[in-house]
Amino acid sequence: MVKRRPTLLAAAALLTLAAPAPASAARKQPPELTRIRCVPATSVTCRSGVKVTIGRQLQISGRRIYKGMRVSFRWPRGALATRLDRTRVGYVVRVPADTRAGRVSVTVSDRAGRRSNARRITVDAPPRIGGPAPSPGTLPDAFRGNGMWIWELARSERGDVAAIAARARAAGISTVFVKSSDGGASRWAQFNPNLVAALHAYGLRACAWQFVYGNDPLAEASLGADAIADGADCLVIDAETQYEGKYAAAQQYITALRATVGPAYPIGLTSFPYVDYHARLPYSVFLGPGAAQANLPQVYWKDIGGTVDAVSARTLAQNRIYGTAIAPLGQTYGNADPDDIARFRALWAGYGSAGLSWWSWQHTGEPAWAALAQPVSPLPLPPADPGWPALARGRKGDQVVWLQQHLAGFDPAVAVTGTFDAATDQALRNFQSSRGLAVTGTTDALTWQAVLGLPVQPVDWRSRR
C-alpha cells in the first residue's frame, strides 16, 4: 500500500486538472450575441436580417442573455441604450427613435456591466410621405364617398376581387376597408400589395384598418406602417374598450406612426359614437393635433337601440367638439332596415358629411346592398342642430380633458386631469365673462365655439404613467 500511494495522489491531481470549470466561472463570462434579425422576418420595412428601420423590433439570439439586459446602439460620436424584452418570438428590442441612420453596432451588457461582442446592423430612417398636413376639419379624399368594410376577405365574395369590384360598382362603393392587423403581433396576410394593386385596377381605393389594444403601441404603429408600405390609400385605427384609460399608449402610437408616415398621410379613427358613455377612451389623443384627420364613429343605430335620427344626432353632438371631419360608419349587418339605411344616408348628407362607410361586407344581405344602390334622397329641410356637450363641475372624461386642454391656455391654473374641478369651473366662468357670454359655468353651444378657438395645450401623457 505504501508503494502505491504516490500513484493515487498523481491520479487525483490529474483528475483535478481535467475537471470542468465550476458554474460560477461560466457566470463570469460576458454575454455573447450570435444572431440579430427583424421582427417579423417578413416585414416590408425590415428588408433583410441586418437592415432595419428606426422604430422596428429586432430579435436577438445568443448566450447568457436575459430579459432586462441593457442593449446599446453605437455609432461614431453617439450611442443610445434601451432594455431587452422577451416575447413569444424570443428576446426582442426596438431600435430607439433617435438612433442615427447608417451602420450601427449593437451590444448587450449584463448586470455586472460585462459587455458582449458587437453585431453590426444597418439602420434606415423611416420613409416619410411628403406634403403638408390637411387643414383641420377637412376630410381627406381617401375617406370621401361610400366605403364598405371587410373583416375577412375570404368570406367577402369568397375573396374574388373581380366579384368585389362588380358588387362595389353596383352599390356605388368607392373605397374598401380591409383588416390588416390585430394588436402588435398579428399581421393579417389578406392585406398585401397584390390585393391593393388588384383593387386599384378596378378603380377602387384600398384602405387598411387595424384593431389596436394599447398593450404594445410601438408594435401596433409598426404594423400600421407596414400596411401603408403595402400601398394602403388610408389607414383606420380601430380603438375600442381595450384602449380605455390608455392615454400614454395612444400618444406613443400616434407619435411613432406619424414619425414614420409624415403629417399628410390620411389616418382615421373608428370607435364608439357616444364619447360620454366611453369617457375614458383617449379620443382627444387619437383626434388631436397631428393625429387622425377623419373620425369614423360606429353609428350602429339598430344595435344601440335607437332611431337613426336620435343616434345620429347624439353622435354628432358628442364628436363635433374635436374638430375632426366626421365620416360615420353605418350599419348594414343584422338585417338593417333598407328604409333606415336610406334615412341614414340622407341625414348625414344633410349634416354635411362628405363620406360614409358600412359594416360589413360579409354580413350585408341583398336588401341592404339594394338600398345602397339607390340614389340619396335629399331631406326636405335641413336637420335640426343636435347641440353640444353640456359640461359642468363634477363631470369627468375625455370631453373634460379636451375642454381643459383649451382652457389651460387661457388660465394656467387649469390642470388637464379629466375632472371638471373648481379651477376648471372658475376658469370657464372667467372665460365666459371675458367673451361677453352668459356666465353659467356650463359649456353651451356659444361657449364651446369660443373655447375651441383657443390653442390646444399639449400634454405629455407618457410622463404621467
Where would I find each of the regions flagged by the language model?
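Short acidic, glycine/serine/threonine-rich helix-capping segments at coil-helix boundaries
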Residues: 391-451
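Beta-strand/beta-sandwich contexts
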Residues: 25-69, 103-105, 114-130
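Acidic, Ser/Thr/Pro/Gly-enriched interdomain connector segments
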Residues: 141, 151-156, 376-418, 457-465
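Active-site groove signature of glycoside hydrolases
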Residues: 174-182, 223-249, 357
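Aromatic-lined carbohydrate-recognition surfaces of secreted/lumenal glycan-active proteins
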Residues: 151, 205-216, 254-280, 324-335
